[in-house]
Amino acid sequence: MFFEFSKVFGFLLAPVHVLVIGALAASLWPYSGKRARSFRLMQAALALLLAMLLAPVGNLLLVPLETRFPPPGSDLGRVDGIVVLGGAVDEVTSGGQGHLGVNSAAERLIAPIALLQRYPQARLVFTGASGSLMPGIQKEGDFVRQFWHEAGIDKGQVLYEEKSRNTYENAVFSKALAQPKPGEHWLLVTSAAHMPRSVAVFRKADFEVTAYPVGFKSTGSLGHWYVPRSAEGALGNVESAMHEYLGLLAYYLTGRIDDAFPAPR
């Protein structure tokens, strides 16, 4: 039930949806004789929306997440394996078109291609089935297989874990599939904002990994002030950040991670 609850509440608590719900509630209050309170709520919702559109709110929220685990640098030493978390495939578009369609996390699928050129002996694990509540959605791995094969990755070099539906299951199921040995060096590839929660659940699963963050969306600095270039990007960054903060809180409260805001060791 955790998976279902997390998806439903995650959808309802997305910033834009909260504002819409607040605006709808405010529109109904005048009929209960509370016009002043209704007007204030509408003003607050509009002010928050304008702040997210005209100020780098998303950047301010993303920077602490994306800078928590910095890129490891060019000298990674020996690399025995690479775990790539799913979430880059737009399953609805891919299923409808019949070929790979990606979202803003596409770099998760691109980075391993270059990594395997540098570390051809490394094993590659892709973990992720579908994070959708809708039945009949085609699994991410079906599209990733074809994409990586066309990119020149040997099919025999990749293990596909296709049962996991969330980050916690990514860690547990990929460890069972990869069976990492003591002393092996594994990289974890996922979006930079997603890395704190991801590393934490892999630690909980006793699968030691080195963070290899990709797909940065922030400037990396809290002092960088700018006007977002698009409403979609501005609201998307806020939603991505809030999704991770809520995910960290939910995982910590349910014992899926040991630290509320994990840090490098």
PLM regions: where:
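Hydrophobic alpha-helical transmembrane segments of multipass integral membrane proteins
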Residues: V18-L24, Q43-L53, Y245
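Membrane-interface helix-boundary motifs at transmembrane edges
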Residues: P30-R40
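A structural signal for short, hydrophobic/glycine-enriched beta-strand patches
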Residues: L46, A51, A55-E239
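Transmembrane helix-loop junctions in multipass membrane proteins, especially transporters and channels
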Residues: R35, P64-P71, G255-D259
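Extracytoplasmic/luminal low-complexity segments enriched in Pro/Gly and acidic/polar residues
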Residues: G223-R229, G236-R265
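Hydrophobic alpha-helical segments of integral membrane proteins
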Residues: M1-F9, V57, L61-L65, M242-L249
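Membrane-embedded alpha-helical segments of integral membrane proteins
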Residues: M1-P30
